Amino acid sequence: MLNELSTRKCTPCQGGMPALDRSEAERYLSQAPGWSLADNGSRIERHYSFRDYRSALRFVVDLSQLAEDEGHHPDISFGWGHATVSWQTKKIKGLHENDFIMAAKTDQIAGDGNGSA
């Protein structure tokens, strides 16, 4: 099923706006299965499993291209058969709708959306 968030584009965040509060973040989180709040609700993260290093690397490269296209960049760590992605809007030191849009798009890149590809 295509997540509605994945069809949207990021809007430039200029800073100076408030981050989503916890209840707003949880509402968006309900549309991003597999993602969880981290750092006291200031970012979201998800762990993905892959069959080998090359698959994890391909995911990271594809996600990096998407981040460049959207102008919104995650923190990524990866190794053999795994990757962890974290989204946060750095200009507001918290979560913005863009983070959840990118989470949905990240799931599309990962393949089946359940954290394994």
Curated annotation (Swiss-Prot):
It is an enzyme of class 4 (lyase). GO terms for biological process: tetrahydrobiopterin biosynthetic process. Pfam families: Pterin_4a (PF01329). GO terms for molecular function: 4-alpha-hydroxytetrahydrobiopterin dehydratase activity. Its EC number is 4.2.1.96. Keywords: Lyase. The keyword Lyase applies. It comes from the Bacteria. It catalyses: (4aS,6R)-4a-hydroxy-L-erythro-5,6,7,8-tetrahydrobiopterin = (6R)-L-erythro-6,7-dihydrobiopterin + H2O. Belongs to the pterin-4-alpha-carbinolamine dehydratase family. This is Putative pterin-4-alpha-carbinolamine dehydratase.
